[in-house]
């Protein structure tokens, strides 16, 4: 199970790195889907209470199987919040994770003992306890159009 989560994170980081390296000084796309979404549900997200208006928000939506990433996006911060909508999602159980990449280096910066220096968060506002949030606690049912407001852990 840990290998699957590691592979998901690795794929996300490599995809972001690829976008950054190919684009040079070009702007990243506002949305970048890792898989083709063909459902009929919309998920609107608002991430509030950010520490600064610098950088980008990186969002990862995973299905309950953990090994298939539903979508990922790179969102500009406007004011101290960021908003994004995902269309065409299938009904199901999903988990959302995000981090605020303030310096736009394509990764969540950590201090010497592994604690994130940049803001991050997850669905259901699951807080980390001696490690990353438990995936099962982040899962939520998506059966109809939904708006999710998320506040980062600073």
Regions found by a protein language model. Give the residues of each.
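A glycine-anchored, Pro-Gly-centered beta-turn/N-cap motif
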Residues: 80, 85, 89-93
């Amino acid at each position: 199970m840990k290998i699957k989560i590691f592979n998901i994170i690795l794929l996300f980081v490599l995809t972001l790195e690829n976008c950054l390296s190919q684009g040079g000084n070009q702007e990243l796309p506002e949305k970048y889907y890792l898989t083709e979404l063909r459902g009929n549900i919309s998920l609107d997200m608002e991430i509030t209470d950010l520490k600064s208006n610098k950088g980008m928000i990186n969002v990862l939506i995973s299905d309950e199987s953990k090994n298939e990433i539903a979508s990922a996006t790179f969102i500009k911060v406007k004011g101290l919040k960021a908003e994004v909508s995902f269309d065409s999602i299938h009904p199901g159980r999903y988990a959302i994770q995000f981090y605020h990449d303030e310096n736009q280096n394509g990764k969540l910066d950590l201090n010497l003992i592994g604690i994130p220096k940049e803001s991050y968060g997850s669905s259901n506002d699951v807080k980390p306890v001696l490690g990353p949030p438990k995936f099962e606690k982040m899962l939520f049912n998506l059966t109809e159009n939904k708006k999710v407001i998320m506040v980062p852990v600073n």
